[in-house]
Design a protein with these regions (language model features):
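Membrane-interface helix/helix-cap signal primarily in integral membrane proteins
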Residues: 3-7, 19-182, 468-475, 481, ...
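Hydrophobic alpha-helical transmembrane segments in multi-pass membrane proteins
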Residues: 3-10, 16-20, 171-330, 389-428, ...
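Non-globular, low-confidence helical/coil segments that flank catalytic cores
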Residues: 46, 75-94, 132, 201, ...
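Residue-level signal for inorganic ion chemistry
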Residues: 47, 137, 151, 277, ...
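Aromatic-rich juxtamembrane segments at the membrane interface
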Residues: 115-236, 243-244, 434, 484, ...
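Hydrophobic alpha-helical segments of integral membrane proteins
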Residues: 133-148, 156, 164, 171, ...
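Hydrophobic alpha-helical segments of membrane proteins
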Residues: 156, 308-321, 343-347, 372
Length: 677
């Protein structure tokens, strides 16, 4: 025991061991190949229901058989209403590997599930219950969920008490944008509140501190079993370690208990370090412990202000690494909301759960909170976009904060680091052309060096991809506005998400094609007029610094595809040609009017349809690389085999195979990257 006490009280041993294990864990989880116990040929799966929910028009169930599986099943009232936690079900269907991100810097669903030890998704054709729940803990969970299912405020009871974030996507997004989402997940603040109630009760019945700590740990462990979450997992391990320290009088420092918490977390679940909730919870707790001496001297209001500012500062790298923007108003919101959540909302949630008569009162408070959050989240002036920082920069950031506890002058380095990250796009001398994977549609980015100009050609017609992948990518490389949105023509697959774009991202000017405005274009123009965004059509050229973009207009056609904006430009010695949906007829007219030879990069017309890319045209322009934006297994049969034959002398990149493609030029050297799904 003495030797153990000596090791635990050492200033460095625990820290060194934990850091070494952390590094080993990163290597192990990223380079070791974890294999599924299922075979892709399996079509029947038996498992216990551990979670289930409705998502749009389908039931999504998580089951535990040989390993965890996600089951997708078309919505069925009868089946959904019969489901309960702990039920054993038989699922028939086909296994498939979860989708990887096919656009740069987008959310990787495959990796997200991999870190949860889920390797397959089942597209179910049938689901049958073969045994009702027999697990005591699941029985309690079912009773608790049944109790609140008809309450107006059930989503907040699930979120604040059951570790089940059932809030609507819009509300969750607003909380995330405003930097207050941590207030709506069961974490240290919530657990401390529950423990304070428990200790108040225990003080009435016993004076033995050891018994209090043991009962407290039992409570947290049972809570974790019922409602597992990463941040609660950290709280549970930390609480147990504090109890062991107290009972055996080991006198371990708080900071070392936190390191031991990480060590045991990694041993129990090596993938815990990739959980965003755990990362945030751990880092904030780490710096709160470092600040504990200061906090002891503060009154309640000063503590709230200090903790809110500290939490904001230490969360900045996590936020910009994952969301690419920081909302500076989040500090004020946290100062305002922490007491409201801890003094009003959380106690009222517990009271409402016990006494449903207060449901309307809780619903009133939460509805007001949602309205405020949704309103504030739409205020763009408080948001600062940062490009995605490297892991090295993040490590330096946290080391500087640690050193600043000894010397406050180090905080100036934080300011310079953030300024450096912010200014990086203006110092980046690379030129980029990016073809986004938008399925059967078009969307391309042209990014000039040092952020001199950013141009988006078309938007595709998938709202999720626009909001969560295209706009997200723009932010991730530090683009804060689009100088031009070029609409090649009025078809939905090319401009279907233009309104979504201008409503969610700053656009300076919009350029339309020649000919009459189509339905989607007219709808967009109404929005542009309201937002006072300038728009043009029938342009001949754009001047970008010392470079020019040419619109190869020939005449107005009866076919809208032939009225597409065909764009030619060069950067240094590289030539680019974007064909929109122009047909063979337009191609011939272009060849008659313009001299286009030895094109470096051709955006193939009309998704590789047989109506475009004639052999004569391809032979004339002689492209080195060809880009085809096409949906996987699309109903049109794009790209056409004859077109592919015409392009056989070029290197072809396709979004259905290669995902997003980045054509990058720096120091007159070309580099091509793909994001294969």
């Amino acid at each position: 025991m003495r030797r153990l006490r000596y090791i635990l009280q050492s200033n460095y041993v625990i820290k060194i061991i934990t850091i070494l294990l952390f590094v080993i864990d990163i290597i192990y989880t990223n380079y070791h190949c974890f294999k599924s116990k299922y075979d892709e040929d399996n079509t029947e799966f038996i498992g216990i229901v551990t979670n289930y929910e409705l998502k749009e028009d389908k039931i999504v169930i998580e089951i535990k058989g040989y390993e965890k599986l996600i089951v997708n099943y078309k919505y069925n009232d009868e089946i959904f209403n019969k489901l309960s936690y702990g039920d054993k079900i038989l699922v028939k269907g086909k296994l498939y590997v979860p989708n990887k991100n096919s656009n740069f810097n987008a959310f990787n669903y495959q990796k997200y599930l991999y870190y949860k030890k889920i390797y397959y998704i089942v597209n179910a054709s049938s689901i049958d219950k073969i045994q009702n729940n027999k697990n005591y803990f699941y029985t309690i969970k079912n009773i608790l969920y049944k109790k609140i299912e008809n309450m107006k405020s059930s989503d907040y009871i699930k979120t604040l008490l059951f570790c089940d974030n059932s809030l609507s996507k819009d509300v969750k997004d607003s909380y995330r944008i405003n930097g207050i989402s941590h207030l709506f997940s069961v974490s240290g603040m919530h657990i401390n509140f529950f423990i304070s109630i428990l200790f108040w009760y225990l003080n009435k019945i016993t004076f033995n501190k050891r018994i209090k700590f043991i009962i407290n740990d039992i409570f947290i462990i049972l809570y974790l079993i019922l409602f597992p979450s990463a941040s609660l997992f950290r709280c549970a391990i930390m609480s147990i370690l504090f109890s062991i320290d107290f009972i055996f009088k080991l006198k371990i420092k708080k900071i070392d208990i936190l390191f031991l918490t990480l060590l045991f977390s990694i041993i129990i679940n090596p993938f815990i370090i990739y959980d965003l909730g755990y990362i945030y919870s751990y880092i904030v707790t780490f710096f709160l412990i470092l600040s504990s001496n200061k906090l002891k001297k503060m009154n309640r209001l000063s503590k709230i202000i200090y903790i809110s500012i500290l939490s904001f500062i230490v969360s900045i790298p996590i936020t910009i690494y994952n969301s690419y923007e920081v909302n500076i108003i989040s500090v004020l919101l946290n100062i305002f909301l922490v007491p409201i959540i801890s003094i009003i909302i959380l106690p009222l949630t517990i009271v409402t759960f016990i006494f449903p008569i207060f449901d309307n009162v809780l619903f009133l408070f939460t509805s007001l909170l949602e309205s405020i959050s949704l309103f504030i989240s739409k205020i763009d002036i408080t948001k600062i976009i940062f490009p995605k920082p490297s892991i090295i920069i993040i490590v330096i950031y946290y080391l500087v904060i640690i050193f600043s506890y000894r010397n406050r002058k180090y905080l100036l380095i934080i300011v310079f680091l953030l300024m450096g990250i912010y200014m990086y796009p203006y110092l980046n001398s690379s030129f980029k052309v990016v073809m986004f994977d938008v399925g059967e549609g078009d969307s391309y980015l042209i990014k000039y060096p040092n952020n001199k100009a950013n141009i988006l050609i078309d938007t595709g017609f998938n709202e999720y991809r626009m909001k969560n992948e295209i706009i997200s990518y723009l932010k991730s490389i530090g683009i804060r506005k689009l100088d031009y949105l070029i609409i090649t023509h009025g078809d939905e697959d090319h401009m279907g998400e233009a309104i979504t774009l201008v409503n969610n991202f700053k656009v300076d000017k919009v350029i339309f094609n020649i000919g009459e405005y189509q339905t989607h274009e007219k709808e967009l123009i109404e929005v542009l007029d309201k937002k006072k965004i300038k728009y043009y059509n029938n342009l001949k050229q754009l001047n970008i610094d010392k470079y020019k973009l040419y619109f190869l207009n020939t005449k107005i056609y009866d076919n809208e595809n032939d009225n597409s904006n065909v764009i030619y430009f060069n950067y240094k010695n590289f030539k680019f040609l974007f064909m929109g949906d122009a047909s063979v007829k337009r191609e011939m007219d272009i060849l008659d009017k313009y001299n286009l030879i030895n094109i470096d990069l051709l955006k193939v017309g009309h998704h590789g349809s047989k109506t475009s890319s004639s052999k004569k045209f391809i032979d004339e322009v002689n492209p080195k690389y060809s880009l085809i934006s096409v949906g996987k297994n699309n109903r049109y049969g794009h790209p056409n085999k004859e077109v592919l034959n015409n392009l056989e002398k070029t290197k072809i990149y396709r979004t259905d195979i290669d995902g997003s493609i980045m054509y990058k030029i720096k120091n007159n050297k070309l580099k091509i990257e793909t994001c294969a799904p």
